[in-house]
Structure formats: structure tokens, C-alpha cells
Regions:
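Alpha-helix-loop-beta-strand connector modules within alpha/beta enzyme cores
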Residues: 22-35
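Glycine-rich beta-strand-to-loop/alpha-helix junction loops that act as flexible
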Residues: 1-7, 44-46
Length: 162
């Protein structure tokens, strides 16, 4: 066991090339001598599929608070728990708007204070109905989803248009 898989760049999903796995494995082959019958196992994880998925959610409401502005979306921590579970960050984009950016807290509809995808981020101005993409959700998004609070599991779709 040589540890966990290769990481990904959550801040710039389009800027990360597909890893050169041959080069990666060759490094181990040069430095590890296996005895007869031994095997080497890798967990490739996020490097293979992390950038292949995005959570697409719809803006339910835009709420102007006293000190901040909220974009409340229909996805919640049940659909992508990484931000709530260990403060993971995902690039978030309003894919319905070309308007100038504004600062939002992007939150889900679940009655939990941890149902937050991001705080104080700049994204294109949000309106009710806008589609919001949480990028880099391909590795552990769907598999870690839950039906907490009677919510349905997210559905997966395949597209090349994002």
C-alpha cells in the first residue's frame, strides 16, 4: 500500500491536465523492489474522475441579509457533503449568467447550519432559476450522497456541454 490517490486542483478544474500515470507508476517501479508474490496496489481516486463531474443545482432564492447576500440552491449537503464534512472547497460558477460578479454565500435548503457550499465568494449575479455548477464533484460527490432529511439521491447525467 503506497497511500492515497493523486489529488486534483479544486480551484482551477480546467487548468489541470490528466496525470501522466505511466510516469507516476515508473517512479515506483524504479524505487520499489517487490519480492516474489508481492503486488503493488494504487488507489487512483480523484485524479481519474474528479474533474469529470459537476453538481448542477438551481437557485431557489436570492436573499439579501443585513451583512451578506445568499444564493440558496436546491442541492444541499446531502448531495455533496465534502464542504460540510471537512470544509472542502469547490469552484462554483453561475452558468446561467454573464452579469457582473457579486459576493454570495452559496447555501443549501437543509435545516442545518453546515449546509453551506461556500462563504463570501464572487460569482456572476444570481437570480431565481439560475443554474449553479459546483465543479470537481466527480470523485466523491454521488457516492457520498445521502437521503438525510427525506431527500432524494442526486441523479447522474452525461454531457459534454459545460
Amino acid at each position: 500500500n503506497v497511500g492515497g490517490g493523486l489529488g486534483i486542483n479544486y480551484d482551477d478544474p480546467n487548468g489541470q491536465p490528466i496525470p501522466n500515470f505511466k510516469e507516476y507508476f515508473d517512479t515506483y517501479a524504479q524505487h520499489l523492489v517487490l519480492r516474489e508474490g508481492q503486488q503493488l496496489h494504487f488507489e487512483l481516486g480523484r485524479a481519474v474522475v474528479g474533474q469529470c463531474g459537476a453538481l448542477i443545482t438551481r437557485t431557489l432564492y436570492v436573499k439579501q441579509g443585513t451583512y451578506k447576500q445568499f444564493a440558496i440552491v436546491d442541492a444541499g449537503m446531502t448531495d455533496l457533503i465534502r464542504p460540510a464534512l471537512y470544509q472542502a472547497t469547490h469552484k462554483i460558477e453561475n452558468i446561467s449568467s454573464d452579469e457582473p460578479c457579486e459576493v454570495y454565500d452559496v447555501v443549501g435548503p437543509i435545516c442545518e447550519s453546515s449546509d453551506v457550499f461556500a462563504k463570501s465568494i464572487e460569482i456572476n449575479k444570481c437570480h431565481r432559476g439560475d443554474l449553479i455548477a459546483l465543479r470537481s464533484a466527480g470523485a466523491y460527490g454521488e457516492i457520498m450522497a445521502s437521503q438525510y432529511n427525506c431527500r432524494q439521491l442526486p441523479k447522474g447525467y452525461v454531457t459534454e456541454d459545460l
